[in-house]
């Protein structure tokens, strides 16, 4: 046997062992009490073998996991991701191990190694996809600088001239940011933030960056609003500029046409960060000049991130996936991008968001939980017109219909842009009515529709 073949076999065996440990703990969190322990162990081993076999059969390592080729830079990136994944593994936060054997050190160690291996694979795949996707040609720096200046001036004027009372979501995130800012900045706090993704509806993913600013500038209202504006609103505006990059001053025009983004941030809703991620998902997935696999992998990760930031954005994720599938009806050649997006989204969702998918999506009855928030469809229509304006929505619809009827090259993007908000509206209104922050679900598609004007 050749040394190279032997090394590959040993590496595959080691990967199988690590993944078996991770799969055992993840399956135990879901199946224990319903399925016997030995059956869970067998299922974990079989699942790990299936993953390793598929990776070998499809040659995923040379195709997707070598962003810099077989070089020291790839090894360094993989090693760093593996170390962080093993060190910060939160799999045991999914259940209480108690005195069970699965809670002992050998199982914890193998699970941590499996978590490190998966995170290394995710990071390498995203790095490879990003390099193949290439750089986006954003507008000149002066336009972005103008947007940043305008946002900060408006934030200062609003903060000085208003006395907003923050309650519910906005107060929760301000309070959690203040709480994190008062704690020691160490590994324990990082673990606390990651554990919150598993255990809390309002996790600390968006509070933690704000808390870093508060450590330096204080925990007052001005600091909170400026942190939201600069950390979360500005990246969303940069996404608008990327969407409308083929139109002269397109980013500025989109920003002016959708003031509800900044206003929602100024009223204390960190949800604008999730809307920004959704905008970037449209930017990447609809750029048909880029490699399909790269677009799909990056978009799948963004669609996972968006609902990790704010749970209700899962409606955006599901509707985007269904709309992407529907859009294949007008351009079947884009199936690779959809397949890559689906695979990336499934892997990232199961690894980072298993608790949410199992406990809140599969086991919860949303119709009963949120029935008190259902105020009828008239309220939804009023909210949409109040925050977007019927003229702007009509203009977006005209752009989409025009491209569907007159611009064959843009039909794929136009159908995606039309189907996503419609599906999202149908899904969301089956559960509850919209609050102010929930309207951010439709902002990415609205911006994408208006940006079709250049085609």
Task: Identify the function of each model-found stretch.
Residues 1-23, 34-158, 340:
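Start-transfer (signal-anchor) and selected internal transmembrane alpha helices
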Residues 19, 73-87, 142-153, 255-256, ...:
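Transmembrane alpha-helix segments characteristic
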Residues 50-63, 118-133, 235-241, 325-328, ...:
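Hydrophobic, aromatic-rich transmembrane alpha-helices
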Residues 172-180, 194-219, 226-230:
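Short hydrophobic/aromatic helix or loop-helix immediately within or flanking a transmembrane segment
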Residues 212, 223-249, 280:
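Transmembrane-helix motifs of polytopic, lipid-linked glycan transferases
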Residues 262, 295-311, 321, 422-425:
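Membrane-interface alpha helices of multi-pass inner-membrane proteins
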Residues 263-274, 435-436:
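Short acidic/glycine- and proline-prone juxtamembrane loop motifs at membrane-interface regions
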Residues 330-377, 383-398, 425, 429-430:
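Membrane-lumen/periplasm interface segments of specific transmembrane helices
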């Amino acid at each position: 046997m050749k040394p190279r073949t032997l090394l590959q076999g040993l590496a595959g065996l080691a990967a199988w062992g690590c993944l078996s440990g991770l799969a055992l703990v993840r399956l135990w969190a879901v199946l224990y009490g319903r399925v016997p322990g030995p059956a869970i162990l067998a299922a974990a081993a079989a699942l790990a073998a299936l993953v390793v076999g598929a990776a070998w059969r499809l040659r995923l390592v040379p195709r997707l996991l070598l962003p810099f080729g077989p070089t020291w830079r790839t090894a360094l990136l993989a090693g760093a991701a593996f170390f962080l994944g093993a060190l910060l593994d939160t799999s045991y936060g999914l259940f209480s191990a108690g005195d069970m054997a699965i809670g002992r050190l050998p199982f914890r160690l193998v699970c941590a190694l499996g978590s490190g291996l998966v995170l290394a694979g995710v990071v390498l795949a995203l790095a490879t996809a990003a390099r193949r996707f290439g750089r986006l040609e954003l507008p000149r720096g002066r336009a972005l600088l103008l947007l940043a200046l305008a946002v900060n001036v408006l934030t200062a004027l609003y903060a000085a001239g208003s006395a907003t009372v923050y309650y519910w979501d906005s107060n929760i995130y301000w309070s959690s940011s203040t709480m994190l800012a008062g704690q020691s900045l160490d590994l324990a706090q990082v673990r606390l933030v990651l554990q919150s993704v598993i255990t809390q509806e309002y996790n600390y993913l968006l509070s933690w960056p704000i808390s870093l600013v508060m450590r330096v500038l204080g925990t007052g209202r001005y600091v909170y609003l400026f942190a939201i504006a600069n950390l979360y609103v500005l990246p969303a505006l940069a996404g608008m500029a990327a969407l409308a990059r083929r139109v002269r001053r397109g980013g500025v025009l989109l920003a002016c046409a959708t003031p509800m983004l900044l206003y929602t941030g100024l009223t204390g809703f960190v949800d604008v960060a999730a809307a920004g991620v959704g905008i970037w998902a449209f930017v990447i997935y609809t750029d048909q000049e880029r490699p399909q696999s790269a677009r799909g992998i990056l978009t799948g990760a963004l669609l996972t991130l968006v609902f990790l930031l704010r749970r209700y954005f899962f409606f955006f994720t599901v509707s985007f996936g269904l709309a992407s599938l529907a859009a294949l009806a007008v351009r079947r050649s884009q199936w690779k991008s959809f397949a890559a997006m689906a695979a990336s989204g499934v892997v990232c969702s199961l690894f980072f968001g298993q608790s949410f998918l199992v406990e809140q999506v599969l086991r919860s009855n949303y119709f009963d939980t949120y029935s008190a928030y259902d105020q009828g469809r008239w309220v939804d229509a009023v909210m949409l017109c109040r925050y977007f304006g019927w003229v702007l929505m009509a203009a977006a619809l005209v752009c989409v219909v025009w491209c569907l009827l007159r611009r064959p090259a843009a039909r794929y993007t136009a159908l995606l842009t039309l189907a996503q908000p419609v599906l999202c509206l149908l899904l969301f209104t089956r559960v509850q009515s919209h609050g102010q922050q929930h309207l951010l679900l439709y902002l990415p598609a609205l911006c994408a529709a208006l940006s079709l004007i250049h085609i």
